[in-house]
A protein has these predicted regions:
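Compositionally biased linear targeting/interaction segments
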Residues: 1-256
């Protein structure tokens, strides 16, 4: 049944984005209308939500000719986000370099990085090797030594591991007040109070272009972003809840 629901969700997403994949607001039927399936003595309720509003850890790298390299815009956004939690600058650089070394194909450590010699050596338990791939889950970050030096809630609250490794980006039309740090990190000249103001007064129908956003907030500086400004999404979360007599079960699926 859940497999059928996923297929229906994919079809619904395809239909909604087929003719306009550049604009997606929270008023879109994709997010408003739930799936409801009546069962004997129970039912299944499924909901699609926007999963783009997070810092994709994989955006820290960009694909070079033969290897992954640092995405300097994304790392600037990362530094700004970490500064709000007063994370020591050296630790921030360790995280950046160790994340890149874990993903890239070579065995040459960056200035603050670590390669297989560390992960397979006596100081690391369990013994393992760098992934030489993008992260699949943020839980994999628990294996990065520098990550263990900061509060895990920072990662849990703001980060994701989407398989696209494009520039740092999220759907501005889906941001909530709790996402003010992310919005501020995207724009070098937008501070927290600016970000909170923008989120508070963003129209429910959202915006479709940067020009429209700038006209709504003319005193805010949206120039030189640390990533890509997006008004739509390609990352979704399908949440399903099945109720059967006294039994309740939940299922979550990421859709890219």
């Amino acid at each position: 049944m859940f497999r059928n629901i996923e297929s229906l969700a994919l079809k619904k997403i395809d239909i909604e984005l087929r003719f306009n994949n550049k604009y997606l607001s929270q008023e879109n039927p994709l997010f408003v209308n739930d799936f409801v399936f009546e069962l004997d003595n129970g039912k299944i309720v499924s909901k699609i939500s926007d999963a783009s509003v997070c810092f994709n850890i994989n955006s820290i790298v960009a694909k070079g000719d033969n290897n992954f390299i640092e995405n300097k815009k994304s790392t600037q956004a990362f530094r700004k986000l970490m500064s709000y939690y007063e994370v020591d600058n050296n630790i921030v650089e360790e995280i950046i370099d160790q994340v890149i070394d874990w993903i890239d194909y070579d065995s040459n450590p960056r200035a603050y990085g670590l390669e297989d010699y560390y992960y397979s050596g006596p100081l690391n338990n369990p013994k393992e090797y760098t992934g030489k791939r993008l992260f699949i889950s943020i839980n994999e970050l628990k294996g990065i030594p520098a990550i263990r030096k900061i509060d895990w809630n920072i990662i849990d609250d703001h980060f994701c591991a989407n398989q696209q490794n494009d520039n740092f980006s999220f759907n501005i039309n889906s941001i909530e007040l709790k996402d003010a740090y992310l919005l501020s990190s995207l724009f070098p000249n937008i501070d927290i109070s600016d970000a909170e103001y923008i989120i508070t007064y963003m129209p429910e129908e959202g915006v479709q272009t940067l020009t429209e956003l700038s006209k709504l907030f003319p005193s805010r500086d949206f120039n030189s972003p640390n990533g890509m400004i997006s008004f739509s999404s390609s990352s979704f979360l399908l949440s399903s809840k099945i109720t059967f007599e006294n039994y309740i079960s939940e299922s979550f699926s990421n859709i890219y």
